[in-house]
UniProtKB/Swiss-Prot annotation:
Organism: Mus musculus (Mouse)
CDD domains reported in the protein's UniProt record: GGTase-I (cd02895)
Catalyzed reaction equations: geranylgeranyl diphosphate + L-cysteinyl-[protein] = S-geranylgeranyl-L-cysteinyl-[protein] + diphosphate
Enzyme Commission code: 2.5.1.59
GO CC aspect terms: CAAX-protein geranylgeranyltransferase complex
Subunit note: Heterodimer of FNTA and PGGT1B. PGGT1B mediates interaction with substrate peptides.
Positions with a binding annotation for Zn(2+): D269, C271, H321
Name of the molecule in the record: Geranylgeranyl transferase type-1 subunit beta
C-alpha cells in the first residue's frame, strides 16, 4: 500500500524527518497566492515577486494545474506600466509590483494613464515577465519596446542599474534582473552590454568572489548574479580567463559546510543552496560538492506541517526560502522536482517554452520582412 505524507509524518525517526514532502509544498505555494500572514504586509509593493516564488515553485513541482492561470495572467498584465499616447513616459515603463497606487485595472495593451508616482521596478519587470512565461503566455500584450526603453533609463554610467527612475541603490542584483529581461525579450538593446560587463568584471574582489560592486565584499548572491548574467549574455569565457574562473570556482566550492553560506564565517542558509549551487552548476563543477550534506540541510529547514522551507532549522518558512530550497534540491535531481535552468532561475520546461517563443518571433519577423520586400518590389 502506498505511503502518504501523513503516514510519514507520524514516524519519529530521522529517516522520516528527511523525506521531501512534495504535496505540503504545493499547498504552501497555493496559500502564498491566496492569503498571506500579516508580517508580509510590508512587502505589498513587491507582491509580484512573491507571486513569482509561488508560481515558479508550483512549476518546479509540476503543479501549475492548481491555479487559475488566466486570472493570474490578467492580473500581471494589469501591473504593466504602459506608455501614454504621447509616449512621454517611456523611461518609466515596465511592471509595477502591485496595485498599491490605485491605478485603474487595465490588462490590455492600450495606452496607459499618466500618474506622477507610477513607474516600473526592475525586479518587478523581471518577475512579471518570468511569471507570464511560466503560465504559458506568449507575451503578446507586453510592450517590449517600452520595457526596453524603461530598462535603458535605469542603467548608470558605471554599468550598474537602479531599480526605479527616481534612483535607488544600484548593484549586481539589478544587473542580473536587466540581463534576464533582455534575455527573455530576446533583445539586448535594453542595456549597454559593454558597460554592464565592465561593472561585473570590476566587482571581482581580492578573494576571487564577486561583490555587489567594485571594492565591496564577495557574496554568494552577487557572485551568482554576475556569473549568471554573463552566461545569459554568452560572454562568461570572454570576460574571465581560465585562471580567474578556476579561482571563482574555488571561492564558491569553499562556501559549503553542510548546506551553503554566502560569505566566510556566516551561518548556512537554505537560499544559498541555489545561489552558490547554481553558480557551481554554471561553472560545471557542482558534481564535486557533497549532495548528501546539502540535501540533509535543506530538508532540515522543511516545515513538516504547513510546507515550505525556512532559512534555518526550526524557523518559520517563507516564500523565498521555500522556492530556493526546492531549486537547490532540483540541482541535485531530487525526485518529484523538475529541472531548474540555473542561469534564468526557472524550470527547464519554461526555458524551452521561451526558446520556442523566440523562434516564433524570429519566424514572424522574417515573414514580415519578406512581405515588405515583396510589396516594395
Amino acid at each position: 500500500m502506498a505511503t502518504t505524507e501523513d503516514d510519514r509524518l507520524a514516524g519519529s525517526g530521522e529517516g522520516e524527518r528527511l523525506d521531501f514532502l512534495r504535496d505540503r509544498h504545493v499547498r504552501f505555494f497555493q496559500r502564498c497566492l491566496q492569503v498571506l500572514p500579516e508580517r508580509y504586509s510590508s512587502l505589498e509593493t513587491s507582491r509580484l515577486t512573491i507571486a513569482f516564488f509561488a508560481l515558479s515553485g508550483l512549476d518546479m513541482l509540476d503543479s501549475l494545474d492548481v491555479v487559475n492561470k488566466d486570472d493570474i495572467i490578467e492580473w500581471i498584465y494589469s501591473l504593466q506600466v504602459l506608455p501614454t499616447e504621447d509616449r512621454s513616459n517611456l523611461s518609466r515603463c515596465g511592471f509595477r509590483g502591485s496595485s498599491y497606487l490605485g491605478i485603474p485595472f487595465n490588462p490590455s495593451k492600450n495606452p496607459g494613464a499618466a500618474h506622477p508616482y507610477d513607474s516600473g521596478h526592475i525586479a518587478m519587470t523581471y518577475t512579471g515577465l518570468s511569471c507570464l512565461i511560466i503560465l504559458g503566455d506568449d507575451l503578446g500584450r507586453v510592450d517590449k519596446e517600452a520595457c526596453l526603453a524603461g530598462l535603458r533609463a535605469l542603467q548608470l554610467e558605471d554599468g550598474s542599474f537602479c531599480a526605479v527612475p527616481e534612483g535607488s541603490e544600484n548593484d549586481m542584483r539589478f544587473v542580473y534582473c536587466a540581463s534576464c529581461i533582455c534575455y527573455m525579450l530576446n533583445n539586448w538593446s535594453g542595456m549597454d552590454m559593454k558597460k554592464a560587463i565592465s561593472y561585473i568584471r570590476r566587482s571581482m574582489s581580492y578573494d576571487n568572489g564577486l561583490a555587489q560592486g567594485a571594492g565591496l565584499e564577495s557574496h554568494g548572491g552577487s557572485t551568482f548574479c554576475g556569473i549568471a548574467s554573463l552566461c545569459l549574455m554568452g560572454k562568461l569565457e570572454e570576460v574571465f580567463s581560465e585562471k580567474e574562473l578556476n579561482r571563482i570556482k574555488r571561492w564558491c566550492i569553499m562556501r559549503q559546510q553542510n548546506g551553503y553560506h554566502g560569505r566566510p564565517n556566516k551561518p548556512v542558509d537554505t537560499c544559498y543552496s541555489f545561489w552558490v549551487g547554481a553558480t557551481l552548476k554554471l561553472l560545471k563543477i557542482f558534481q564535486y560538492t557533497n549532495f548528501e550534506k546539502n540535501r540533509n540541510y535543506i530538508l532540515s529547514t522543511q516545515d513538516r506541517l504547513v510546507g515550505g522551507f525556512a532559512k534555518w532549522p526550526d524557523s518559520h518558512p517563507d516564500a523565498l526560502h521555500a522556492y530556493f530550497g526546492i531549486c537547490g534540491l532540483s540541482l541535485m535531481e531530487e525526485s518529484g522536482i523538475c529541472k531548474v535552468h540555473p542561469a534564468l532561475n526557472v524550470s527547464t520546461r519554461t526555458s524551452e517554452r521561451l526558446r520556442d517563443l523566440h523562434q516564433s518571433w524570429k519566424t514572424k519577423d522574417s515573414k514580415q520582412c519578406s512581405d515588405n520586400v515583396h510589396i516594395a518590389t
